[in-house]
Amino acid sequence: MEHKKLIAVKREKPLISSYLDNKNKNPYVSDLNRANFFYANFVTKVEIERATVFKIRFQQGFGSELRGHHFVVAMQTSKESNQLVTIIPLSSVKETKQYNKKSTIFIGEVSGIPNTKQSVALVNQIRTIDKIRLFGDRALATFVDMVCDEIDKYKGEFEIQEKEIYRLTKEQFEIILDAIDNYLLIGSVKRKYY
């Protein structure tokens, strides 16, 4: 298990927000918008290597979309200057559930993850996310006392506590890449692991 530190830097040109006009009387929506606006005003400075596994929180989902906390695997190396990373969610195997063998791929146990079970990669739920989602809960916890007016006054950068990250084995990552090839019907693609 390794640790990474995230450096978040205030954007040079702050975003203009209609979120913070206090017209919305619902405190939950208001707090959610405040958190979203806070994240949007920072860019992350961290390199993510492919096959790295993180735990993130998916926001509200519709129907069968994922929601809540899940482990995800980064599908490509994302340089410090790139704000996005493409991920595939992982889920634990449920004995009673029948899986689509083309879109839900068995990858076994991911070493290092606490209370780990046999895992599957949900290839049909591949998505691209902003890197702040990898560290977002910790960012919010770090600044829970900060009010919106103070956010605008804040200058410079902040460090967020270390975050545990894990890695898939080369074999596990190859299984996922093969599954993507088959799922998208693109055939074999020349690729390298690290």
Give the ranges of each region predicted by the language model.
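Short, surface-exposed secondary-structure edge patches
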Residues: V43-E47, G63
